[in-house]
């Protein structure tokens, strides 16, 4: 499986099979705004909330893609949508 070039609706089975780049990490953008899956050279994959607040870019680790504390793509989308709603209400 190749790295996606643009935003994709990330599915668990596809995400587990995203290739590891031994030289650098990369991010896969989900179709849900501000949700990214970060793939590290070690093979570790985790969800990231990537947003701009008051002109400053922020990245918040949500949790791992697999393992005992795994966060599913659906749960990651729910979390980001909730945070985005709260962030917009506070503006």
Label for each model-derived stretch:
Residues 1-91:
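Basic/aromatic DNA-contact patch characteristic of tyrosine site-specific recombinases
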